[in-house]
């Protein structure tokens, strides 16, 4: 039995008083003080961990102003505040103690657009890709690019002055910010825009907080103008935080306070809105993927690409390429980056040309390609091949791979992981190759592996050395390397921070600004935040205050993780290896990961949030001397003793009386998971929440009773076959209003599905497929076996959507094969989802033995529901290991593709069909939609894939009363719109859950693709 974890870091009374008064004064946002909420805000995409005291989620600038006004009261003068955006920073920019002000949950509105003048006004929580999706119909985009664009907020981009691919042409974020609305500590609203110097000077004479700010920035930047110009490196990725260089324009006629706020990392004010310059979308885009025999060759050849007037040149090394090859993302780009025969590709330059004049762009591209052919022929520059991509879809797939490369590095095998700490150094591009040679020599001298990729055209290369932060000696080495890289970048006239902000690295600022200019930064900080209450420890302390700076060797996640025994870390690596990349925060409703995060906007309910909580739970167990691996081994094989039952009952009674146990917070996070398994493939680190969720639930319920619904769900495969003998009787009973009311109130289940009428057995009476014995199958000759298909039943389709199985049997017959309906054998997936892992292992072993016996017949076995079929491949393998055996159950599309391989494609005509894939299917098998389309094409039918996210049903998730609202909300995110615009009778869904959800919400259901094929084939 796990212990009660009754202690967690408390919240100081002053913080609680502040939050209470904040709500009393009309704050309309959310506040959070639970340990789980604070833990999710204690990390970002960096190696650091710092627990805040509380989190607030404002809904408007007025809410932020209320926070700032109340904070200015003397009684709260000791509280500190840190603005936070998407939480994707790689250097801990938004990590701090005190109160986190999260702008991402609610402040995500696009306020207005002026296409004629080319600008848009947004709130700080708008995500970069969200904005570009909105701008696309207007023919515009927000140009600064970054790898986390589908979850990074514009407020975060402004605060770090982010930039990435294309910066040589498009510049940094600050080059596109026309003005901001910022709230100062005290509640004053500061609106910035470029002003004539005379007006700025006049504003500086005002005896107000804003006047003091204008005066300080104006006077310091004017008086130190020459020093600033001399000290700021002449780089595309210029020095920011604070950008003293660009406050005045070159002619000294214009003053723009915006430039001080961009890159300020929340140390000066709360940026709540911004007016942004938007760029016309280029009409023509071409990509040339240039392949090299070494990474050094790729680096040294990059200036040649820039000279060819390319928009951007992105470089990727062999380590990153090889990790991409092992990831699901490679499926989408493999044809665009093929291997060169008899050559090893060890470097890649992704070269983009873009513009409005197609003839001019093609002329430049062709000139480059001619020159590349010459280099290949003469064996020069290490070029071994190239491929051109002319289609926009292909260009976007290549960049999606490049973006995912950031996270893929974290999936490297072993305890040492490539980590960010000196990854965005910037040097003059002409020195980059030599600089990187020295950088590599430095890392090689310590015997470290590393991955490299980046924006070689701008002199920025992302370098992530592999270190084990659970090893104190390697943590010390990380600081040593940081110091060495500072010296190395200075040697080449570069910067330590080219695009990702300073964060915990701000201690190195004097080395780049110089002591005299660093003192000027402190004066600016003092004008905005004299008492150092906004994100203290970052950028610089205010003048006149001897306040400490954050350090590179501050507390890291590894400091906490190393408290967990190595064996536990290894066995629970699905949670331990989360590096915080945050891809699970992807805003796109059509992205399958993560539906619970999308509908709640609560990061507790994301793979990252759940992994964070489980890591802390394991640490707290270790702190109490509890070994979860030993507990798992000691779990009883069957039943529980009366003594244990009494103890669980007592513990559950106390839990219902709100007795605290951190395990309850973890349980709450796990309960929101749909177990769709999208994270197990879509996450670059392959964080498999359903797997460690099941293990947690199993251990949690050693202390607490399980709800009745869990037992009902886990035994559905036992009682469904019994009820199916009299389906009308069961359906009549379950349809009674009183029964439904009791089910919702006392069991917690709603909209229970009805059994199929007639049942599958009734439909198959007398059919040969249901009447063949094992002996008859074994007696078939080789030719007969080659034409026989074994249909594997699953509990949901066979008993609740039996027509699909019956139609598949008929389809197999229609194609000239002999279908045989195998006896139903429980799959066990429902047991796995609910954490009945011992019971699941028994079920899996019994069914695996049966299917292995069938596999020896040498006939294909086929199932129709993707989630259940894939359970045989994934969960069975984890539960049984080698005892699983070698059996293979094919999905319907896999078998059809093989069976129809020799059949030519017919002329495609007629109205389209529309394919809705199951989450588990399309994430684990990304080629499934195309495979289905190819099958339909063989019969002259067109099948179009519909890009949607999760339907919200996910097995029994949508039937649980506590999930009902979220289940319907998830459906609304993408499925409902698609169903409304497409003819329902042409929509097809492979998942039973998906079809069930459509019928529940829309009133009429959709069919399985095999049913459409049965109709199509004459």
Q: For each predicted feature, which ranges?
A:
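A glycine-rich phosphate-binding loop feature that marks nucleotide/adenosyl-phosphate handling sites
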Residues: 88-90, 148-155, 239-247, 314-331, ...
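Mobile "lid/hinge" segments at catalytic clefts and subdomain interfaces of large enzymes
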Residues: 157-159, 163-250, 254-325, 330, ...
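Iron-sulfur cluster-binding electron-transfer modules in prokaryotic oxidoreductases
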Residues: 529, 536, 690-1018
């Amino acid at each position: 039995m796990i212990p009660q974890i009754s202690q967690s870091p408390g919240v100081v009374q002053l913080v609680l008083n502040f939050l209470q008064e904040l709500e009393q004064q009309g704050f309309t946002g959310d506040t959070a003080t639970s340990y789980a909420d604070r833990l999710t805000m204690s990390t970002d995409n960096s190696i650091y961990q710092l627990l805040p005291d509380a989190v607030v989620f404002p809904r408007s600038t007025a809410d932020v102003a209320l926070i700032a006004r109340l904070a200015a009261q003397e009684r709260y003068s000791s509280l500190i505040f840190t603005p936070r955006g998407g939480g994707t920073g790689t250097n801990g920019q938004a990590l701090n103690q005190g109160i986190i002000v999260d702008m991402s949950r609610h402040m995500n509105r696009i306020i207005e657009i002026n296409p004629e003048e080319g600008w848009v006004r947004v709130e700080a929580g708008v995500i970069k890709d969200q904005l570009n999706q909105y701008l696309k119909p207007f023919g515009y985009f927000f140009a600064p690019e970054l790898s986390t664009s589908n979850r990074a907020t514009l407020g975060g981009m402004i605060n770090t002055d982010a930039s990435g691919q294309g910066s040589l042409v498009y510049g940094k974020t600050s080059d596109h910010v026309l003005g901001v609305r910022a709230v100062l500590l005290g509640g004053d609203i500061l609106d910035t825009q470029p002003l004539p110097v005379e007006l700025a000077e006049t504003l500086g004479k005002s005896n107000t907080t804003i006047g003091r700010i204008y005066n300080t920035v104006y006077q310091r930047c004017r008086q130190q103008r020459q020093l600033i110009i001399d000290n700021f490196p002449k780089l595309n990725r210029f020095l920011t935080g604070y950008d003293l260089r660009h406050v005045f324009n070159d002619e000294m006629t214009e003053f723009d306070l915006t430039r001080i706020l961009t890159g300020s990392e929340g140390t000066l004010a709360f940026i709540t809105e911004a007016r942004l310059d938007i760029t016309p979308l280029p009409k023509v885009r071409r990509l040339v993927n240039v392949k090299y025999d070494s990474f050094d060759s790729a680096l040294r050849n990059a200036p040649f690409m820039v000279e060819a007037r390319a928009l951007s040149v992105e470089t990727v090394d062999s380590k990153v390429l090889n990790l991409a090859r092992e990831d699901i993302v490679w499926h989408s780009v493999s044809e665009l980056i093929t291997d060169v025969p008899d050559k090893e590709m060890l470097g890649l330059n992704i070269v983009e040309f873009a513009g409005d004049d197609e003839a001019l762009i093609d002329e430049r591209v062709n000139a480059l390609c001619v020159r590349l052919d010459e280099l290949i022929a003469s064996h020069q520059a290490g070029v071994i091949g190239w491929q051109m991509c002319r289609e926009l879809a292909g260009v976007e797939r290549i960049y999606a791979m490049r973006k995912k490369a950031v996270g893929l590095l974290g999936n490297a095998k072993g305890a040492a992981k490539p980590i960010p700490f000196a990854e965005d150094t910037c040097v003059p591009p002409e020195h980059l190759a030599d600089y990187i040679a020295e950088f590599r020599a430095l890392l090689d001298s310590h015997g470290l592996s590393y991955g490299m990729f980046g924006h070689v055209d701008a002199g920025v290369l992302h370098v992530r050395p592999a270190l084990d932060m659970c090893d104190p000696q390697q943590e010390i080495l990380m600081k040593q390397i940081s110091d060495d890289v500072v010296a190395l970048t200075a040697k080449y006239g570069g910067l330590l921070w080219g695009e990702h902000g300073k964060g915990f690295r701000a201690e190195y600022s004097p080395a780049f600004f110089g002591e005299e200019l660093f003192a000027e930064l402190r004066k600016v900080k003092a004008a905005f935040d004299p008492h150092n209450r906004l994100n203290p420890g970052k950028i610089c302390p205010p003048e006149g205050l001897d306040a400490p700076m954050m350090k590179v060797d501050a507390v890291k996640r590894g400091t906490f993780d190393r408290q967990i025994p190595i064996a536990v870390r290894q066995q629970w690596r699905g949670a331990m290896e989360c590096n915080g990349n945050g891809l699970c925060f992807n805003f796109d409703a059509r992205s399958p990961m993560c539906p619970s995060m999308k509908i709640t906007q609560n990061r507790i309910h994301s793979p990252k949030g759940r992994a964070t909580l489980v890591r802390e739970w394991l640490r707290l167990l270790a702190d109490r001397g509890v070994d979860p691996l030993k507990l798992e081994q000691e779990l009883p094989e069957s039943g529980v003793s009366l003594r244990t039952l009494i103890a669980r009952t007592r513990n559950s009674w106390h839990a219902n009386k709100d007795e605290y146990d951190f395990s309850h917070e973890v349980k709450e996070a796990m309960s929101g998971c749909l177990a769709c398994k999208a994270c197990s493939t879509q996450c670059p680190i392959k964080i498999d929440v359903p797997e460690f969720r099941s293990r947690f639930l199993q251990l949690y319920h050693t202390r607490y009773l399980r709800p009745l619904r869990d037992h009902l769900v886990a035994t559905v495969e036992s009682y469904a076959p019994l009820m199916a003998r009299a389906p009308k009787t069961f359906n009549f009973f379950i349809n009674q209003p009183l029964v439904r009311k009791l089910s919702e109130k006392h069991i917690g289940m709603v909209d229970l599905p009805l059994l199929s009428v007639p049942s599958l057995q009734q439909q198959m009476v007398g059919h040969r497929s249901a009447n063949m014995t094992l002996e008859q199958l074994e007696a078939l000759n080789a030719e007969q076996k080659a034409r026989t298909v074994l249909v594997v039943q699953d509990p949901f389709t066979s008993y609740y959507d039996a027509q699909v199985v019956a139609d598949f049997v008929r389809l197999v017959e229609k194609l000239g094969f002999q279908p045989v309906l195998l006896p139903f054998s429980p799959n066990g997936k429902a047991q796995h989802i609910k954490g009945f892992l011992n019971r699941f292992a028994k079920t899996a072993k019994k069914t695996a033995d049966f299917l292995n016996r069938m596999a020896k017949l040498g006939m294909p076995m086929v199932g129709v529901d993707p989630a259940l079929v894939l359970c045989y491949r994934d969960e069975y393998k984890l539960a049984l290991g080698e005892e699983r055996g070698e059996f293979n159950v094919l999905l319907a599309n896999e078998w059809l593709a093989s069976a129809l391989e020799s059949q030519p494609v017919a002329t495609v005509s007629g109205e389209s069909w529309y394919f809705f894939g199951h989450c588990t299917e399309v994430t684990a098998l990304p080629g499934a939609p195309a495979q289905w389309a190819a099958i339909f094409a063989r019969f002259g039918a067109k099948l179009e894939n519909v890009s949607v996210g999760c339907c919200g049903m996910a097995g029994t998730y949508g039937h649980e009363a506590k999930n009902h609202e979220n289940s319907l909300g998830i459906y609304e995110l993408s499925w409902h719109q698609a169903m409304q615009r497409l003819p329902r009778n042409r929509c097809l869904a492979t998942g039973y859950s998906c079809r069930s959800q459509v019928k529940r919400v829309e009133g009429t259901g959709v069919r399985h693709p095999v049913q459409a094929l049965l109709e199509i084939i004459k």
